[in-house]
Amino acid sequence: METYGLETLGIINPSAVYRNLTPAQLTEHALRRGEGKLSNTGALVVKTGKYTGRSANDKFIVDTPAVHDEIAWGKVNRPIEKAKFEAIKSKVIAYLQNKEVFIFDGFAGADPKYTQAFRIVNELASQNLFIHQLLRRPTAGQLKDFKADYTIIAAPGFKCIPEIDGTRSEAAILVDYAAKLVVICGTQYAGEIKKSVFSVMNYVLPKMGVFPMHCSANMGRDGDTAVFFGLSGTGKTTLSADPNRLLIGDDEHGWADDSVFNFEGGCYAKCINLSPEGEPEIYNAIKFGALVENVVMDDETREFDFDDDSLAVNSRVGYPVEYIPNAELSGMSSSVPKTVIFLTADAYGVLPPISKLDKNQAMYYFVSGFTSKVAGTEIGITEPVPTFSTCFGEPFLPLDPSVYAAMLAEKVEKSDAHVYLVNTGWNGTGKRMKLSYTRAMVTAALTGAIEQSEFVTDPTFGVQVPTSIEGVPSELLIPANTWEDKAAYQASCQKLAKSFVENFKKYTHMSTEVVAAGPKAE
């Protein structure tokens, strides 16, 4: 039996080894193994059990001399001793003996100058299907000569014992940058594999002069490129899927000297309240070859109920970028971005739905990474919680935030890009901004039409706010107009402004100009 070099990991007697199977073969294996069911559209549908989102508190980085001084240790990048990592790894390897093993050998990074080769070793065929569709798939020639830079082992069926293993729970995501190895166990949420790849890219690329971004990206027919930063649930995937523009990617990109490139070859979209009217591209991508997680499906008709969140609010679908009609399949733009959009979901209801930032404000709001945690993207979040996530991607950034902030400033300055802050969250009415209005605002930013508007300065946040945009009721553009109780509006403004100021105190390395670009707290 061909083992494709698995013995180098210590997996010496698997019952079967499958490498780079087609989506059809992987779907067959998953059904045979009882991992999921087929929907009426032909998609493979699985339930991931108790873990339906990232388990952020269960992620650890192996603390070795080689990386100790590089990693920004803290509540996000928690250290674990090498010996503990080795002990868990040995148990996971032992667990995989005599089991079927599914390998996907592929790539992250569409630009060949910066590509990293990943070997993903899966216990589950369904997870192997997911990563096959999410990463960049090799040609036959590339597969023949394949040599992995990094390896990820995903064994959801192996449960850690915290008292013995030194973990927080039965689940663990363990990253050893020195050994170029990631071990994921105890959780079946496929997003953990994808985000482990992202964490690796965020470690590797800055050393190559590339700015890694938690963003979506698209480009106009004439090549003008835009990037959309934002945390889960703020609209990256939705807003970058634009029928008038080519989608480069929906979540993870690198900004090089001459282009933006996708790390991935697929998309991982939220399914809650999905409709053919609201998001036709995503809705139509749920077909054969796609992996659907935690969407309620009728057992008889095999039809989805996207509005039912009883399995998870964070229901998801993974599919290859080819399933989006206007995808840029090369995964690369032909130029650097001219428009940079920071997406935020403000639960206070006081940030303007769109505003323009100067250079210092761009640095301030990027580093702050303000949003409200939206239900479902992490275990235990059910109501919006205001939060700050450094550089809109703190859970995935192993290096000091100043590294990424400096890279943004340098790239924006070089490309002369316009930077906008877009609030996809709530306003004074207590309702969330309509998607159609947000789309109209984003379109105005991309086409430059927004520049024809008159701008006023927001008294608290100092940003420039347009007073009119085609297709958007003018009263919604100025947050104060949506509040009946002006005193309550002022109180909310101050509450949020103070949160910003308090949060920014930890960034002691920032210039006085950048600090002064923040909100005015009284």
PLM regions with names:
Residues 1-144:
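N-terminal accessory targeting/assembly segments
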Residues 148-150, 154-204:
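Charged, amphipathic alpha-helical linker segments immediately N-terminal to NTP-binding catalytic cores
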Residues 2-42, 50-51, 206, 214-231, ...:
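Glycine-rich, often acidic-flanked micro-motifs
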Residues 476, 481-522:
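Generic C-terminus detector
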Residues 68-73, 176-185, 385-391:
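Gly-rich Lys/Arg/Thr-decorated short loops/hinges at beta-loop-alpha junctions or inter-strand turns
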